[in-house]
Amino acid sequence: MPLVSISLRKGKSETYRQALIDGVYQAMRDTFSVPEDDQFITVTEHDPSNFRYGASYLDIARSDDVVFIQISAMASQTSDQKKALYARIVELLANNPGMRPEDVFVNVIEGVKENWSLGNGIAQYA
């Protein structure tokens, strides 16, 4: 049950933002075996003055189209699954909405099952 936050600079269309959501969700389904309808994703747009990135950190040439994707998930994925997720996200977002691979920044944060309550004030997975 991943919880996803996508951050980008203001100015992209609703269609573009929806393509980000759809691509990340499909990549998680393909690599993390996320079930259908397990969609908990937000998109936050930022004014340029509130959005900073390293334009060439680690010799990766990022543009103003860079997107930060942070995925909080239970600690159950292998290193290979995470690598596959990163590659699949880049592949899908390159296809639609046409992102450059250099502009896809992904961070996975893992936690234990008892750290999750999906509603009703209970820990469904603990």
Predicted regions and their residues:
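Interaction-mediating elements
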Residues: 1-126
